[in-house]
A protein has these predicted regions:
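Cofactor-/ligand-binding subdomain signature composed of acidic, glycine-rich
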Residues: 1-40, 161-199
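Short gly/ser/thr-rich secondary-structure transition/capping motifs
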Residues: 24-29, 71-77, 117-118, 197-200
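Glycine-rich phosphate-binding loops that contact phosphosugars or nucleotide phosphates
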Residues: 38-187
Length: 201
């Protein structure tokens, strides 16, 4: 676990930097179009465990900035909620392994109701990645420890970047503000390295 904590700055760099064009988030290489963000009138975040907690943090950022409803559902309960989901709903599905059974079942339900699914996963070729409409691959590398560290950090970064791109696309912020959001995110890496460097203290 300690090893994986020390790997967090590199994992964040590997996840963030390839998706910056200048100082703005750009998902062209991921095949995630801006139209996806323009066409939704609500967001449903679906996940389990630590990934769900990343979703809770994202809701606190997204809802006030985007001014659309954001709901976080634990995947195992999503099927029993009779969810109000349609083609105007963006389903953001989070799973480190991409194989979480409850999350996969919830994603399948959301898609059957018409919602496009954007997954945030760490394992290429996983079932959730294959079955979702769009994929944001994090680059945390293998995570062996039971307690999630670097996978959680890159999930938060992915959600932050998605929120920033959505806000820019929907006119909720301008390029200067979006650029500042990204500078703030990159500053987290520097702060993290400073703290890790003091770990022997």
């Amino acid at each position: 676990m300690l090893k994986e904590i020390h790997e967090q700055p590199e994992a964040l760099r590997n996840t963030i930097l390839p998706r910056l064009s200048g100082n703005l988030p750009d998902f062209t290489a991921d095949g995630i179009p801006d139209e996806l963000f323009l066409n939704c009138n609500q967001i449903r975040i679906i996940a389990c465990g630590t990934a769900m907690h990343a979703g809770i943090v994202a809701k606190a950022l997204m809802e006030p900035l985007l001014r659309i409803p954001v709901t976080v559902s634990i995947a195992s309960e999503f099927r029993y909620e009779d969810p109000l989901v349609d083609e105007k709903t963006l389903a953001i599905v989070i799973s480190q392994s991409g194989e979480t059974i409850d999350t996969l079942a919830a994603m399948r339900l959301a898609r059957s109701l018409g919602a496009p699914a954007l997954s945030i996963v760490n394992v290429k070729g996983s079932t959730i990645a294959r079955e979702s409409d769009y994929v944001f691959y994090t680059h945390a590398g293998p995570e062996i420890a039971v307690a999630s560290t670097k996978a959680y950090s890159v999930q938060l970064a992915a959600l932050y970047m998605l929120c920033c791109r959505m806000a820019l696309t929907r006119g909720c912020c301008n390029k200067a503000e979006a650029g500042q959001f990204m500078e703030d995110l990159l500053a987290v890496i520097t702060a993290m390295e400073t703290m890790i460097g003091r770990s022997d203290q």
